[in-house]
Amino acid sequence: MSMLIRAGKKSFGVWMIAISLLLTLSACGTSGGTNGGAASGTAGGKDTTVPAAKPQEPAKEVPKELPTINVAYMPDIHGATPIVLGEEKGYFKEAGVKINAVKFLSGPPEFQAMAAGDIDIAYIGPGATFLSAQGKGNIIAVDSLNTGDMVYATKKSGIKDWKDLKGKTVGVPKGTSGEMILNLGIKKGGLKPEDVNAVNMDVAGAVSAFVAGKVDAVAIWSPYTSEIEKQVGKDNIVKLGDNKMFFPEYVFPQSWVVNPKFLKEKPELVEKFLAAWVKANDYRIKNIEETIKLTAKYTQVPEDSLKVQVDTTEWIESKKQVDYFKDGTVIKWYENLEKLFVENGKLTEVVKGDTFVSPAPFLKVVK
Protein backbone atom coordinates (compact mmCIF):
# COMPACT_ATOMS: atom_id res chain seq x y z
CA MET A 1 0.00 0.00 0.00
CA SER A 2 2.72 2.40 0.93
CA MET A 3 4.56 1.40 -2.23
CA LEU A 4 1.51 2.20 -4.32
CA ILE A 5 1.19 5.56 -2.64
CA ARG A 6 4.89 6.28 -3.25
CA ALA A 7 4.53 5.20 -6.88
CA GLY A 8 1.47 7.41 -7.26
CA LYS A 9 3.29 10.36 -5.76
CA LYS A 10 6.24 9.80 -8.09
CA SER A 11 3.90 9.49 -11.06
CA PHE A 12 2.06 12.61 -10.03
CA GLY A 13 5.35 14.52 -9.77
CA VAL A 14 6.39 13.48 -13.29
CA TRP A 15 3.04 14.66 -14.65
CA MET A 16 3.41 18.02 -12.90
CA ILE A 17 6.84 18.54 -14.42
CA ALA A 18 5.52 17.63 -17.88
CA ILE A 19 2.59 20.04 -17.56
CA SER A 20 4.93 22.81 -16.40
CA LEU A 21 7.20 22.28 -19.42
CA LEU A 22 4.24 22.34 -21.80
CA LEU A 23 3.04 25.65 -20.37
CA THR A 24 6.50 27.15 -20.76
CA LEU A 25 6.82 25.98 -24.37
CA SER A 26 3.33 27.27 -25.10
CA ALA A 27 4.24 30.71 -23.76
CA CYS A 28 7.44 30.81 -25.86
CA GLY A 29 5.53 29.74 -28.97
CA THR A 30 3.02 32.54 -28.50
CA SER A 31 5.78 35.14 -28.17
CA GLY A 32 7.63 34.14 -31.32
CA GLY A 33 4.58 33.49 -33.45
CA THR A 34 2.93 36.93 -33.34
CA ASN A 35 3.58 39.32 -36.29
CA GLY A 36 3.20 43.08 -36.39
CA GLY A 37 2.16 43.59 -32.74
CA ALA A 38 3.22 43.08 -29.05
CA ALA A 39 3.06 39.50 -27.85
CA SER A 40 3.23 38.65 -24.12
CA GLY A 41 3.17 35.61 -21.90
CA THR A 42 4.68 34.28 -18.68
CA ALA A 43 7.49 31.87 -18.21
CA GLY A 44 8.62 31.18 -14.69
CA GLY A 45 6.52 34.15 -13.49
CA LYS A 46 8.48 36.69 -15.59
CA ASP A 47 7.01 39.13 -18.14
CA THR A 48 8.15 38.16 -21.63
CA THR A 49 6.67 41.10 -23.61
CA VAL A 50 8.22 41.36 -27.11
CA PRO A 51 8.60 44.88 -28.64
CA ALA A 52 6.31 45.61 -31.61
CA ALA A 53 7.90 45.16 -35.02
CA LYS A 54 8.71 48.43 -36.87
CA PRO A 55 6.20 49.20 -39.63
CA GLN A 56 7.64 48.68 -43.11
CA GLU A 57 8.61 51.86 -44.97
CA PRO A 58 6.56 52.42 -48.12
CA ALA A 59 8.42 51.55 -51.31
CA LYS A 60 10.08 54.55 -52.93
CA GLU A 61 8.20 55.75 -55.98
CA VAL A 62 10.18 55.14 -59.17
CA PRO A 63 10.37 58.36 -61.26
CA LYS A 64 8.26 58.07 -64.37
CA GLU A 65 10.22 58.23 -67.60
CA LEU A 66 9.35 61.31 -69.65
CA PRO A 67 7.63 60.72 -72.99
CA THR A 68 10.02 61.01 -75.93
CA ILE A 69 9.47 63.16 -79.02
CA ASN A 70 11.55 62.37 -82.11
CA VAL A 71 12.61 65.70 -83.60
CA ALA A 72 14.37 66.32 -86.91
CA TYR A 73 16.78 69.25 -86.81
CA MET A 74 19.22 70.89 -89.19
CA PRO A 75 22.72 71.98 -88.07
CA ASP A 76 22.20 75.74 -88.18
CA ILE A 77 20.97 78.70 -86.15
CA HIS A 78 17.35 78.01 -87.13
CA GLY A 79 16.92 74.27 -87.13
CA ALA A 80 19.20 73.35 -84.22
CA THR A 81 19.15 76.24 -81.77
CA PRO A 82 15.68 75.68 -80.23
CA ILE A 83 16.72 72.10 -79.51
CA VAL A 84 20.10 73.18 -78.12
CA LEU A 85 18.61 75.84 -75.84
CA GLY A 86 15.70 73.63 -74.87
CA GLU A 87 18.14 71.05 -73.55
CA GLU A 88 20.76 73.46 -72.18
CA LYS A 89 18.27 75.62 -70.27
CA GLY A 90 16.05 72.75 -69.18
CA TYR A 91 12.97 73.93 -71.08
CA PHE A 92 12.06 70.48 -72.36
CA LYS A 93 12.46 68.94 -68.92
CA GLU A 94 10.25 71.66 -67.45
CA ALA A 95 7.63 70.92 -70.08
CA GLY A 96 7.76 67.23 -69.23
CA VAL A 97 9.19 65.77 -72.44
CA LYS A 98 12.40 64.16 -73.62
CA ILE A 99 13.82 64.96 -77.05
CA ASN A 100 15.47 62.50 -79.40
CA ALA A 101 17.14 64.84 -81.88
CA VAL A 102 17.91 63.45 -85.35
CA LYS A 103 20.12 65.35 -87.80
CA PHE A 104 19.00 66.09 -91.38
CA LEU A 105 20.37 68.44 -94.04
CA SER A 106 17.20 69.16 -96.02
CA GLY A 107 13.43 68.96 -95.76
CA PRO A 108 12.25 66.20 -98.14
CA PRO A 109 14.07 63.38 -96.27
CA GLU A 110 12.45 64.62 -93.06
CA PHE A 111 8.99 64.20 -94.55
CA GLN A 112 9.92 60.70 -95.65
CA ALA A 113 10.96 59.93 -92.08
CA MET A 114 7.67 61.34 -90.79
CA ALA A 115 5.72 59.18 -93.22
CA ALA A 116 7.61 56.15 -91.91
CA GLY A 117 6.72 57.10 -88.34
CA ASP A 118 10.33 57.77 -87.36
CA ILE A 119 9.97 61.54 -86.86
CA ASP A 120 7.27 63.39 -84.92
CA ILE A 121 8.28 67.04 -85.33
CA ALA A 122 10.71 68.64 -87.79
CA TYR A 123 12.29 71.93 -88.79
CA ILE A 124 12.01 72.74 -92.51
CA GLY A 125 13.16 75.51 -94.79
CA PRO A 126 10.80 77.36 -97.15
CA GLY A 127 11.58 75.04 -100.06
CA ALA A 128 9.94 72.02 -98.44
CA THR A 129 6.70 73.84 -97.65
CA PHE A 130 4.97 72.26 -100.65
CA LEU A 131 5.11 68.92 -98.83
CA SER A 132 3.11 70.44 -95.99
CA ALA A 133 0.63 71.78 -98.53
CA GLN A 134 0.29 68.19 -99.77
CA GLY A 135 -0.88 67.20 -96.29
CA LYS A 136 2.33 65.51 -95.16
CA GLY A 137 3.06 67.80 -92.22
CA ASN A 138 1.16 70.48 -90.29
CA ILE A 139 2.94 73.77 -89.67
CA ILE A 140 2.78 74.59 -85.95
CA ALA A 141 5.30 77.45 -85.65
CA VAL A 142 7.21 79.91 -87.80
CA ASP A 143 10.87 79.79 -86.86
CA SER A 144 11.94 82.91 -88.73
CA LEU A 145 12.05 84.55 -92.14
CA ASN A 146 15.00 83.60 -94.31
CA THR A 147 17.10 85.85 -96.51
CA GLY A 148 20.08 83.49 -96.72
CA ASP A 149 19.33 81.47 -99.88
CA MET A 150 21.67 82.36 -102.72
CA VAL A 151 22.71 81.38 -106.20
CA TYR A 152 26.47 81.55 -106.73
CA ALA A 153 28.26 81.17 -110.07
CA THR A 154 31.94 80.46 -110.58
CA LYS A 155 33.82 83.38 -112.06
CA LYS A 156 35.36 81.19 -114.77
CA SER A 157 31.87 80.16 -115.96
CA GLY A 158 31.33 83.60 -117.46
CA ILE A 159 27.93 83.93 -115.78
CA LYS A 160 27.20 87.50 -114.76
CA ASP A 161 23.40 87.64 -114.73
CA TRP A 162 20.40 85.31 -114.51
CA LYS A 163 20.02 85.17 -118.27
CA ASP A 164 23.55 83.75 -118.52
CA LEU A 165 22.40 80.53 -116.85
CA LYS A 166 21.09 79.28 -120.20
CA GLY A 167 22.79 76.01 -121.05
CA LYS A 168 24.75 76.01 -117.79
CA THR A 169 24.87 73.33 -115.10
CA VAL A 170 23.62 74.25 -111.65
CA GLY A 171 23.96 72.03 -108.57
CA VAL A 172 20.89 72.27 -106.34
CA PRO A 173 19.28 70.18 -103.60
CA LYS A 174 15.78 69.96 -105.05
CA GLY A 175 12.79 70.58 -102.84
CA THR A 176 14.68 73.25 -100.92
CA SER A 177 14.59 77.03 -100.58
CA GLY A 178 17.73 77.17 -102.73
CA GLU A 179 15.76 75.72 -105.62
CA MET A 180 13.03 78.32 -105.08
CA ILE A 181 15.49 81.19 -105.50
CA LEU A 182 16.96 79.50 -108.57
CA ASN A 183 13.52 79.18 -110.16
CA LEU A 184 12.67 82.80 -109.42
CA GLY A 185 16.00 83.85 -110.92
CA ILE A 186 15.45 81.77 -114.05
CA LYS A 187 12.10 83.47 -114.52
CA LYS A 188 13.61 86.90 -113.84
CA GLY A 189 16.22 86.23 -116.51
CA GLY A 190 13.52 85.49 -119.08
CA LEU A 191 14.40 81.80 -119.21
CA LYS A 192 12.42 78.60 -118.85
CA PRO A 193 13.35 75.77 -116.45
CA GLU A 194 14.34 73.55 -119.38
CA ASP A 195 16.89 76.17 -120.48
CA VAL A 196 19.03 75.34 -117.45
CA ASN A 197 20.64 72.03 -116.53
CA ALA A 198 19.63 71.87 -112.86
CA VAL A 199 21.23 68.79 -111.29
CA ASN A 200 19.73 67.43 -108.09
CA MET A 201 22.43 66.97 -105.43
CA ASP A 202 22.50 66.66 -101.68
CA VAL A 203 23.87 69.63 -99.77
CA ALA A 204 27.39 68.27 -99.30
CA GLY A 205 27.54 67.17 -102.93
CA ALA A 206 26.45 70.57 -104.22
CA VAL A 207 29.07 72.38 -102.15
CA SER A 208 31.83 69.96 -103.17
CA ALA A 209 30.88 70.14 -106.85
CA PHE A 210 31.02 73.93 -106.83
CA VAL A 211 34.36 74.05 -105.00
CA ALA A 212 35.81 71.47 -107.42
CA GLY A 213 34.51 73.38 -110.44
CA LYS A 214 32.29 70.51 -111.61
CA VAL A 215 29.24 72.78 -111.89
CA ASP A 216 28.88 76.32 -113.20
CA ALA A 217 26.66 77.49 -110.38
CA VAL A 218 25.07 76.35 -107.14
CA ALA A 219 21.78 77.18 -105.41
CA ILE A 220 22.40 76.85 -101.69
CA TRP A 221 21.90 78.65 -98.38
CA SER A 222 23.74 79.94 -95.34
CA PRO A 223 25.87 78.67 -93.60
CA TYR A 224 27.00 76.58 -96.60
CA THR A 225 27.47 79.75 -98.66
CA SER A 226 29.98 80.87 -96.04
CA GLU A 227 31.85 77.58 -96.37
CA ILE A 228 32.02 78.02 -100.16
CA GLU A 229 33.42 81.53 -99.75
CA LYS A 230 36.13 80.24 -97.42
CA GLN A 231 37.23 77.48 -99.78
CA VAL A 232 36.95 79.29 -103.12
CA GLY A 233 37.43 82.92 -102.13
CA LYS A 234 34.90 85.70 -102.68
CA ASP A 235 36.86 87.00 -105.67
CA ASN A 236 36.13 83.77 -107.53
CA ILE A 237 32.37 83.92 -106.96
CA VAL A 238 29.60 85.82 -108.72
CA LYS A 239 26.48 86.26 -106.59
CA LEU A 240 23.42 86.25 -108.84
CA GLY A 241 20.82 86.88 -106.14
CA ASP A 242 19.18 85.95 -102.86
CA ASN A 243 15.78 86.11 -101.15
CA LYS A 244 15.85 89.87 -100.72
CA MET A 245 15.84 90.32 -104.47
CA PHE A 246 12.25 89.03 -104.50
CA PHE A 247 10.88 90.86 -101.44
CA PRO A 248 8.20 91.91 -100.62
CA GLU A 249 6.26 89.88 -103.18
CA TYR A 250 7.70 86.69 -101.75
CA VAL A 251 8.53 86.05 -98.11
CA PHE A 252 10.34 82.88 -97.11
CA PRO A 253 9.24 81.51 -93.72
CA GLN A 254 11.14 78.70 -92.06
CA SER A 255 8.86 76.39 -90.14
CA TRP A 256 8.36 73.70 -87.55
CA VAL A 257 6.02 70.97 -88.71
CA VAL A 258 4.39 68.01 -87.00
CA ASN A 259 3.48 64.58 -88.29
CA PRO A 260 -0.34 64.77 -88.80
CA LYS A 261 -0.80 61.41 -87.08
CA PHE A 262 1.25 62.55 -84.08
CA LEU A 263 -0.77 65.77 -83.81
CA LYS A 264 -4.02 63.82 -83.85
CA GLU A 265 -2.97 61.13 -81.38
CA LYS A 266 -0.76 63.12 -78.99
CA PRO A 267 -1.76 66.80 -79.10
CA GLU A 268 -0.65 67.26 -75.48
CA LEU A 269 2.94 66.38 -76.42
CA VAL A 270 2.85 68.88 -79.29
CA GLU A 271 1.80 71.55 -76.81
CA LYS A 272 4.57 70.56 -74.40
CA PHE A 273 7.13 70.76 -77.21
CA LEU A 274 5.88 74.22 -78.16
CA ALA A 275 5.92 75.38 -74.53
CA ALA A 276 9.66 74.68 -74.50
CA TRP A 277 10.19 75.92 -78.06
CA VAL A 278 8.63 79.31 -77.28
CA LYS A 279 11.04 79.87 -74.38
CA ALA A 280 14.00 78.80 -76.51
CA ASN A 281 12.92 81.03 -79.40
CA ASP A 282 12.64 84.15 -77.28
CA TYR A 283 15.89 83.38 -75.44
CA ARG A 284 17.67 82.98 -78.78
CA ILE A 285 16.55 86.41 -79.96
CA LYS A 286 17.61 88.16 -76.74
CA ASN A 287 20.90 86.30 -76.23
CA ILE A 288 22.26 85.78 -79.73
CA GLU A 289 25.98 85.70 -78.82
CA GLU A 290 25.53 82.95 -76.24
CA THR A 291 23.20 81.17 -78.64
CA ILE A 292 25.85 81.13 -81.37
CA LYS A 293 28.44 79.61 -79.04
CA LEU A 294 26.10 76.88 -77.78
CA THR A 295 24.87 76.06 -81.28
CA ALA A 296 28.41 75.92 -82.67
CA LYS A 297 29.42 73.49 -79.94
CA TYR A 298 26.41 71.27 -80.60
CA THR A 299 26.49 71.29 -84.41
CA GLN A 300 30.26 71.65 -84.94
CA VAL A 301 29.47 74.48 -87.37
CA PRO A 302 32.00 77.34 -86.99
CA GLU A 303 30.76 80.38 -85.07
CA ASP A 304 31.61 82.67 -87.99
CA SER A 305 29.28 80.72 -90.27
CA LEU A 306 26.45 80.94 -87.76
CA LYS A 307 27.02 84.69 -87.40
CA VAL A 308 26.59 85.06 -91.15
CA GLN A 309 23.34 83.15 -90.89
CA VAL A 310 22.11 85.48 -88.16
CA ASP A 311 22.66 88.39 -90.55
CA THR A 312 20.39 86.72 -93.12
CA THR A 313 17.52 86.09 -90.72
CA GLU A 314 14.48 88.06 -89.59
CA TRP A 315 13.47 86.79 -86.15
CA ILE A 316 9.91 86.71 -84.87
CA GLU A 317 9.22 86.92 -81.14
CA SER A 318 6.65 84.41 -79.94
CA LYS A 319 4.01 86.98 -78.95
CA LYS A 320 4.39 88.71 -82.30
CA GLN A 321 3.86 85.37 -83.97
CA VAL A 322 0.53 85.09 -82.17
CA ASP A 323 -0.54 88.33 -83.88
CA TYR A 324 0.58 87.01 -87.27
CA PHE A 325 -1.41 83.82 -86.74
CA LYS A 326 -4.54 85.68 -85.68
CA ASP A 327 -4.56 88.37 -88.38
CA GLY A 328 -3.96 85.91 -91.22
CA THR A 329 -0.42 87.07 -92.07
CA VAL A 330 1.04 83.58 -91.69
CA ILE A 331 -1.60 82.06 -93.96
CA LYS A 332 -0.83 84.67 -96.65
CA TRP A 333 2.90 83.90 -96.47
CA TYR A 334 2.36 80.22 -97.15
CA GLU A 335 -0.34 80.62 -99.78
CA ASN A 336 1.95 83.00 -101.66
CA LEU A 337 4.73 80.42 -101.58
CA GLU A 338 2.31 77.88 -102.99
CA LYS A 339 2.04 79.96 -106.15
CA LEU A 340 5.74 79.36 -106.76
CA PHE A 341 5.27 75.64 -106.24
CA VAL A 342 2.44 75.60 -108.77
CA GLU A 343 4.67 77.39 -111.29
CA ASN A 344 7.50 74.89 -110.90
CA GLY A 345 5.20 71.86 -110.88
CA LYS A 346 5.59 70.90 -107.23
CA LEU A 347 1.87 71.56 -106.68
CA THR A 348 -1.06 71.35 -109.07
CA GLU A 349 -3.01 74.11 -107.32
CA VAL A 350 -2.93 76.52 -104.42
CA VAL A 351 -4.74 75.01 -101.45
CA LYS A 352 -6.09 77.00 -98.53
CA GLY A 353 -3.40 77.65 -95.97
CA ASP A 354 -5.58 76.68 -93.04
CA THR A 355 -5.63 73.09 -94.33
CA PHE A 356 -1.97 72.62 -93.40
CA VAL A 357 -1.21 75.47 -90.99
CA SER A 358 -2.33 74.48 -87.47
CA PRO A 359 -1.94 77.44 -85.08
CA ALA A 360 -4.18 76.05 -82.30
CA PRO A 361 -1.40 74.40 -80.23
CA PHE A 362 0.77 77.53 -80.44
CA LEU A 363 -2.10 79.84 -79.50
CA LYS A 364 -2.93 77.58 -76.56
CA VAL A 365 0.63 77.81 -75.26
CA VAL A 366 1.19 81.54 -75.79
CA LYS A 367 -1.62 83.57 -74.26
PLM-predicted stretches and their roles:
Residues 264-346:
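Secondary-structure end/capping motifs
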Residues 24-27:
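C-terminal motif of bacterial Sec signal peptides marking the signal peptidase cleavage site
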Residues 36-37, 41-202, 216-222, 239:
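Short, glycine-/small- and polar/acidic-enriched structural segments
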Residues 144-153, 236-260, 314-316, 354, ...:
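Periplasmic-binding protein-like
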Residues 126-128, 198-199, 204-208, 212-297:
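Pocket-lining segment of extracytoplasmic ligand-binding domains
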Residues 334-367:
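Conserved C-terminal helix/tail region of periplasmic/extracytoplasmic solute-binding proteins
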Residues 29-32:
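Bacterial signal peptide processing site
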Residues 3-16:
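Bacterial N-terminal signal peptides that target proteins for export
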